[in-house]
C-alpha cells in the first residue's frame, strides 16, 4: 500500500512596496502584543561612574549579559610564556651568584651583577665571595689577606681542569709556567700597585688657629675647605687684603700662616720677612701656597723664612698635607720651647754667679 505525500508549497512573501506599508509593518514588529519577538537592548542606562567599575572587572566573572562580553568569553585564549629559564641562563653562560654561608656579611649584601669575562670583584676584609655556575661548578674566588696598603691580592679563576692565577704586588715582573701533562696553566702577573687614595685616615682634632692670605677668593675657599678636612676644630681666618696681615699677626697668636706669593701692594715674600723679623714669632709656621715653584723661587722662599711651599693646584693627598703641616708646627713649637728653656737656664746661671761673687766679697 503506497502512501501519497503531498508536496509542501510555500506561499510567496509579499514585500511592502509603498512607504505606508513599510511604516505599518514596522509598527507591527515593534508592538508589545507580538510574543514571538524578543527585544535585546545593548544600551546601558547609567552614568559613567556606574559603568566604570564594571569595565575594570574580569569578563569571565562579570554579571552583565552583554553580547560583546559573551563573544570575548567564547573567543578568549590563555597566553602561556614559552620562555624557558634554563635556556635563558645557558644563553648568558649560566652565570649565577652564590654568596658563601661562611661570609658573616652575607645578609647585608645584595645580588651583584657579574660579567662572564670581567667579573666585578667585591673587596671585603677577611671574607670571600664565591660565584658558582650549576653546569660546570666553576668558582671565582677572591680573597684579600691584608687591608693595609700596599697589599697583596690573589685572584684565582677556575674553569674545569685549567686554572688562571694572578697575583698583584708592589714589584714589576711576569712569569708563566705551562704543564701539558695535566692540562693546567698557571700564570702569575705582578704589577706595581697604584696608590690613588685621597681620603684622610685620621683628622687632627687640635684647635689650631690658621691665617689664610690670598687675593683670589676661589683659591681662598679651596684652601679653607681642605684645612677644615684636616683640622675640623681649627679656627681659620681668611684675608683677601694683604695689607691687614701685619696687624692681625701682631694682635693674634696663630699656629700657621698660609700665604700666596703674588699679591698686590704686599706680596708673600714681604709678609714672611715681616714675620721672621720679630723674634717672638719664631714659633709661627709660614707656608706658601703658590704657582711659583722653580728652583730659584724655592731657594728664595727658604732664605726668606718660609717653611714649606705647596704648589697650585692643591692636588696633594690629605695625609701628606697633614703630616707636613703637623711636622712643621711641632718643629717650630719645639724650637721655641728650647729657646725659652735655654734663656731660663742662662738667667739661673747668671743669678748663681752673682750670688757666689757676693759671697766671696763678703
From Swiss-Prot:
Q: What does this protein do?
A: Required for stress adaptation, morphogenesis and virulence.
Q: Which residue stretches belong to region Disordered?
A: 1-39, 163-188
Q: Which Gene3D superfamilies match?
A: 3.40.50.2300
Query: Does this entry carry the keyword Chaperone?
Result: no
Q: What spans are recorded as compositionally biased (Low complexity)?
A: 19-39
- Give the protein name, as stated in the record: Stress response regulator protein 1
> Ranges for the Response regulatory domain?
209-327
Protein's organism:
Lodderomyces elongisporus (strain ATCC 11503 / CBS 2605 / JCM 1781 / NBRC 1676 / NRRL YB-4239) (Yeast)
- Keywords in alphabetical order, please: Phosphoprotein
Q: Which residues form a coiled coil?
A: none
The encoding gene = SRR1
| GO biological process, any | positive regulation of filamentous growth of a population of unicellular organisms in response to biotic stimulus
* InterPro entries according to UniProt: 2C_system_His_kinase, CheY-like_superfamily, Sig_transdc_resp-reg_receiver
Q: Which residues carry this modification: 4-aspartylphosphate?
A: 260
